[in-house]
From Swiss-Prot:
This is Recombination protein RecR. It comes from Chlorobaculum tepidum (strain ATCC 49652 / DSM 12025 / NBRC 103806 / TLS) (Chlorobium tepidum). Belongs to the RecR family. NCBIfam families: recR. May play a role in DNA repair. It seems to be involved in an RecBC-independent recombinational process of DNA repair. It may act with RecF and RecO. CDD domains: TOPRIM_recR (cd01025). Keywords: DNA damage, DNA recombination, DNA repair, Metal-binding, Zinc, Zinc-finger.
Length: 204
């Protein structure tokens, strides 16, 4: 059953395009927007536009940062251990590790994983930028790369690919411990488990 209003249906369809949002949830969100005050809806619309116009990727680590703050605050922080880079799939994993308060190294965000079935190859994610980043480190400061990708087939494939590229550079390549369930997404793992996984990392 579809609504007679074209505007309502259009908004439902747009909400339903979001990850994890089905039509029923999209309908509820649309009804909420309809019943909300205009000023609140305008705030939402403004926030959506701002996130596209004012958020960029850090030129060093590829994490998200505000326009005008590049490199990001993590890359420029004097308190970070610059000898270690933790490689993650998306910015949500950076936030997850930061919430633990234990990891003090740097990050590199791939923005995806290798997935041949989905047509995603190494050139479609930020692997090249990682290799170039380590290659231009003239001080030789990067000694370890921690692969913290989701425990999926795609994550494993990506980890092995990166490991093969880094080992000839003399980099110690490790992965977080296996205590995280296979198929789980790191952004939903609690802080204590993530901390133990990072502390228990092992060589590949």
């Amino acid at each position: 059953m579809r609504y007679s209003s074209g505007a309502v249906e259009a908004l439902i369809e747009e909400f339903a395009k979001l990850p994890g949002i089905g039509r029923k949830t999209a309908q509820r969100l649309t009804m909420h927007v309809l019943h909300e005050r205009r000023s609140e809806v305008e705030k939402l619309a403004s926030a959506l536009i701002d996130v596209k116009e004012k958020v960029i990727r850090c030129s060093v680590c590829q994490n998200i940062t505000d326009l005008g703050v590049d490199p990001c605050h993590i890359c420029t922080s004097a308190g970070r251990d610059r000898s270690v880079i933790c490689v993650v799939e998306s910015p949500t994993e950076v936030l997850a590790f930061e919430k633990t308060g234990h990891y003090k190294g740097l990050y590199h965000v791939l923005h995806g994983v290798i997935s041949p079935l989905d047509g995603v190859g190494p050139d479609d994610i930020k692997v090249r930028e990682l290799i170039a980043r380590i290659g231009v480190d003239s001080t030789g400061g990067v000694r370890e790369v921690v692969l913290a990708l989701n425990p999926t087939v795609e994550g494993e494939t990506t980890s092995l690919y990166i490991s093969k590229l880094l080992k000839p550079l003399g980099i110690n390549v490790t992965r977080i411990a296996r205590g995280i369930p296979v198929g789980a997404e790191l952004e939903f793992i609690d802080e204590a488990t993530l901390s133990r996984a990072m502390e228990g990392r092992s060589a590949i």
